[in-house]
Amino acid sequence: MNPDNPPSIQMIADKVGLSKATVSRVLRNIPGHKAETREKIIKAAEELGYTSHPIMSAVMSSVRFKKTSEYSPIIAEIHCQPWGRKRAWNMEILREHIHKQAVQLGYRIEEFHWFDPEMKPQRLMQIIRARGIRGVILEHFMASNMELDVDISDLAVVSIGGGLRFPRLHRIEVNYFGGLLTAFKQLRSLGYKRLGVALPRFFETMSEFKREGALHIAHQDMDPSDRIPIFHMEDDEPFVGFEAWLKKYKPDCILGVGRSLETQLAELGYSFPKDIGFVHLGWHPGYEELAGVNPNWGTIGETAVNQVVEQLNRNVCGVPEHPLRILIDGSWVEGPSVRLPESITVTESKK
């Protein structure tokens, strides 16, 4: 076979006596066909010169692997947050989109938990292999220095979040750095000048202080008198010194995460946006009364599935030599916790 003139799908279809559409679906690893049909098409494709095609290799591997599995291809979603922790709204959005995207690509999701007290990680990986699962999504470790002591050499694995330090896998992350810069740009366009950032130190450590780094960059474009240092909320006593920080630096808008910060400001007598603006840097639909930056957890989940499937299609497993780090940009969300631009206010007042 001339490598510059590979066989067409129609040629394979003619050889096996099946439709062109059926052959095309099998070669793209789309479920819905009997194992015998898939093997017949793969064999014919190899005989016609497809043996070295990377996708073909992945499909053939998949055919062999599914003999020990249920028919539908499966991706394991391993929850990596602390056992017993209530799942936050953003994690539910992530989970929902992981499932939806898997279905779109012809897969389904089975869920596991890394910190299941009745199952060690080594046992978990044995179960995954026994079920014929080859694709794995590690869903957001909360710790900032996690290391995996398990063999993943035969699995296509993607990690969500930056908590996993070893091994270095392909990972999908929130663009914390860009999200803060987006918020600053929007707020300054609304007339805010003194922007104060208050964040849990735990979150900053987990994200490698990306927002604090972005704050340093944003300050370079501000009058020195308007630069306010970050307020780190400590784990045990998050608001010790917070009121003093507010009085000393007098921010006209606060950027942070979580209900506790919003509540603390209200208890100190601040109302939004009359006394001070408030922006939630981890916005989701549960915060519809606030302005914020939506990290787009749904897109993060979809991208994680895409990356796992892409590895499966290329028959690539194990720890990558050069891991990808994909950052998902956040989106600015308008809300009543920040004031409107003067031009808009004037226009509305005339109506």
Question: Where do the PLM segments sit?
Answer:
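Periplasmic-binding protein-like
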Residues: 76, 130-140, 194-200, 229-232, ...
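Hydrophobic alpha-helical segments within soluble ligand-binding/sensing domains
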Residues: 170-197, 238-243, 295-316
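An alpha-beta-alpha
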Residues: 183-222, 318-339
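Short beta-strand elements in bilobed, periplasmic/extracellular small-molecule ligand-binding domains
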Residues: 102-115, 196-198, 209-239, 280
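Amphipathic helical "hinge" segments at domain boundaries
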Residues: 2-4, 10, 48-124, 201, ...
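Flexible loop/hinge segments that line or gate small-molecule binding clefts
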Residues: 139-179, 278-291
